[in-house]
Amino acid sequence: MVDSNTQYPETGALAPAPADSLLISNVLVYGEGEPTNVFVKDGVIAAIGGTHEADRTIDGNGGVLLPGFVDMHVHLREPGREDTETIATGSAAAAKGGFTAVFTMANTTPVMDQPVIAESVWFKGQNIGLCDVHPVGSITKGLEGKELTEFGMMARSEAKVRMFSDDGKCVDDPQVMRRALEYAKGMDVLIAQHAEDHRLTEGASAHEGENAARLGLRGWPRVAEESIVVRDAIMARDYGNRVHICHASTEGTVELLRWAKSQGIPITAEVTPHHLTLTDERLETYDAVNKVNPPLRESRDAEALKKALLDGTIDVVATDHAPHGSEDKCCEFENAKPGMLGLETSLSIIVDTFVATGLADWRFVARVMSERPAEITRLPGQGRPIAEGEPANLAIVDPGKTWTASGADFASKAENTPFEGQEFSAKVTHTVLRGKVTCADGVAQNA
C-alpha cells in the first residue's frame, strides 16, 4: 500500500479536473468484496459506497476497479516521427489500456535534452487531456554518451522532468555513468539505464542461442545486458543514487537484481509483457514484428522474469511501447527496426498470465502497473489508494471480456503488435483521469 504521508516533487501544471460529479456504479474495488459505488467530485474520490446523484454515471457492470496505470517506458515518437505515432494517438492508446500517466522516452528528433522540447511535450499532453505524458530527459546530450544533459534545468522546467534515460542506447562509458548518478543524486531524479554493451551486440538481431544459430541470425548474448546491470548496481552502491534497469530480459539479470537488492543497493527494474510471455521460438517465421531490443530470449528467461515480478525482485511492468511503420517492419529481419506496440495489450497480458492462472490477485496488478511505477518515479497523484480524498485516477477492467488483438483496431498509428490474432480474457472498459472519462466502453474519448 502506498504511504499517504510521502511527499513527491510536483509535476508540471496539470489541466484542471472537471468541476462536476461522476458516479462509478457496480464495481469491485481491487476485485474484492461486494460490488459498490464510487462517487467522484471535482476530480477527487468523495465517497465509496452509498447512493449519490451525479452529473455523469458509469455502469461498471461488476468490473474490477483499479488505480490508473503508470507506464514508465513508452515511445510516442513526437517530435520527429509523427508518421508512426503522435502524442495524441499515443495518449489515446494509453487511455484504452487503462493508463493515466506515461513516461515518453528521449530518443526523439530532436533529442529531449533541452527544457523547451520537454515542455512542448508536456503541454501538448495536457492539452490533449487523455493521459499525463511525462517527458523523459536524455542522460547525455544528443544521446551521444559523452556530455551530460543539464538535469537541473530540465527538472526545474515547466515539464518538471524527473527521469533521465538514453534508452535505445546504453550509457556505456563508466565515467559518464558515474557522473550522471552523482549529478542526479543532488536533485533526486531517476537514472534509467538501457543495459547493453554495444561491443557485444554489434550487428546482432536475435537472442544468441540455438534458434538464432540455426536460422543464420547474428546472436545477442545475455552478457551484453548482465555486464552493464552488475556494473551499474555497484555504481549505485558506491555513489548512493537510485538506478533503474529498463526492460530486464535474462535469467542472469534477475539473479543480479536479487543480489543487489539483498545488499540494500537502491536499484529497481522493469519487465515488458512481451519478455514475460514470448520467446525466441517465434524467430522461425523471420517476421520482424518479433524483433525487439533487447531480443526475445528463451523460456527459462521468461520463467525467471515471471517469478521475479511475483516476488518483487523486478518492480514493475512497463510496455516499451515502440510504434513502427510497415516500411520498418516489412523487410529483412536484420534490417528491421526493433520494437513492439504495448499500451493496448499490457493489462490483458498481465491478467491472463498472473490473475487468470491463480498466480496473483488484483492487488498485484495494481502494485506492478500503478503503485510501484508511481513510487519509483516520485509521481504525486498517481498510483494512489482507491480511497476517499484521493485523486480519481482509475481504470475499470472487465475480467470476463474476451477479445482478439488486432493492430488495425488499435488507437496507435502503427500496427506492429506481436499479439495479432491472440485472444485475451480481460479488457479495460473505462479509464478516468482526475474525474475525466478518457476511455468509455473501450473507446478513447475525444479531448
From Swiss-Prot:
Substrate binds at H75, L76, R77, N107, N293, H324, P338, G339. Its cofactor is Zn(2+). One of its GO terms (biological process) is purine nucleobase catabolic process. Keywords: Hydrolase, Metal-binding, Pyrimidine biosynthesis, Zinc. Binds 2 Zn(2+) ions per subunit. Belongs to the metallo-dependent hydrolases superfamily. DHOase family. Class I DHOase subfamily. This is Dihydroorotase. The gene is pyrC.
